[in-house]
Amino acid sequence: MMASLAAFVDSRRAAGIPIKFVPPGDRDVRYYLSRMGMGKVLDAAEVNHGLPSVNANMALTQRALVEVAAFSSEDDVAALVSIVSYQSVAPGLQRAVSRALLEAGCNVPEHARVPRGFMAGQVINNQLRLSVADAGVGVLSTLEGSGATSEKQALLMAVNGTSEFADADRGRGLKSIHESISTHGGRGALISGQSVVTMSPNRLFAWTGNSSSYAGTILDVVLPIS
């Protein structure tokens, strides 16, 4: 959920709300946060963080790691799309996820009503984990005009292809991910407010009742690598 933390920090900075960051006590966790780029995010928000400096491994970055970074266009999500293409992910799932990422790059300013979202990606234990997040208005606000009356309903509508816009090409990204996970495996979660919809090969399940509410939207996808 590194991308959602970055989006949260960015939104608080934009609102002029003071941010206090307490670095983890575990040295390995501090280095992991630095390697994933959280120090840069906190630096940009002018937050004192105490995270260590690390040297980037460019070869690793190109094939197995995308640091937390802001995006607001298709071009900005190119690094995340590239890591999907590099790994041995089932072609159908690869196409679906790449399409959803590109759609997110285009749509965050329109749908979320914020200038940018945040993304991150990493290969761990033969799985590729991707996260995109924004601290915008949330899925319910976006889809109220399309008939959504609850966060849970809005998330299900989004995963089944409903878009805020009437354009037939809109809203296909999340639906394609759901369909491809059903065929090729993996799992995904779309989170907004206090609600979550999870995607797995055999099930699409939505529920409300998160102990904390996230003001915005998070997409977290885990893809199997063959």
List each model region and its residues.
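ATP-lid-like helix-loop hinge signature
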Residues: G105-E144, S200-T208
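A contiguous, low-structure linker/loop signature
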Residues: R27, Y31-V68
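A short mid-domain helix/strand-loop element embedded in enzyme catalytic domains
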Residues: A69-L102, I124-G136
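Accessory, usually C-terminal, subdomains that scaffold auxiliary metal cofactors
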Residues: V139-S141, A148, N160-A166
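Amphipathic alpha-helical interaction surfaces in cytosolic regulatory modules
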Residues: M1-D43
